[in-house]
Design a protein with these regions (language model features):
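Accessible peptide chain termini
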Residues: 1-2, 119
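N-terminal amphipathic/basic leader segments beginning at the initiator methionine
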Residues: 2-47
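Mg2+-dependent prenyl diphosphate-binding active-site environment of isoprenoid biosynthetic enzymes
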Residues: 41, 49-142
Length: 142
């Protein structure tokens, strides 16, 4: 699926979930983490030049696909619903919030000289310091 199709499918799932909310906020977070992860990842571009995928977009996608709870974008959607908004208009903001958090984690791991994040070696150890810094900066720009 292309990114636009992923976004449409993800939004349809989130709209269905919003129409039938679970009994607890915790259930909402658990039930919707995967679909929001797919939505967030659909905002990661791909490049026409293979180096862009190798050295920038690929590392960010790999990092982003390694999970996380996706609480921040889910809270953004919940806030949108709480004030009567249309969550379709909150998708880019929700994704930007998660990408900002991703950038903070990548840069924090460098500053702290961390060795693992989410059970795997940190990006600066697997991809190199330069790629990790640039990937974190890319995530900030999204």
């Amino acid at each position: 699926m292309n990114p636009a199709e992923v976004r449409n499918e993800s939004m349809n799932e989130l709209l269905t979930a919003a129409a039938n909310p679970p009994a607890s906020f915790e259930e909402y977070l658990i039930q919707n983490a995967k679909v929001v992860g797919d939505l967030v990842n659909s905002y990661i571009p791909s490049g026409d030049h293979p180096d862009m995928d190798t050295y920038l977009y690929g590392p960010l996608m790999k990092y982003s696909e390694n999970g996380g709870k996706r609480h921040r974008p889910l809270i953004c959607f919940a806030a949108c619903v709480a004030v009567g908004g249309d969550i379709r208009h909150a998708a880019s903001a929700a994704s930007a919030i998660e990408h900002f958090h991703t950038a903070a984690l990548i840069h924090d791991d460098i500053a702290d000289e961390a060795t693992t994040r989410r059970g795997v070696p940190c990006m600066h150890l697997t991809e190199g310091l330069g790629i990790a810094i640039n990937t974190g900066d890319l995530a900030l720009s999204m």
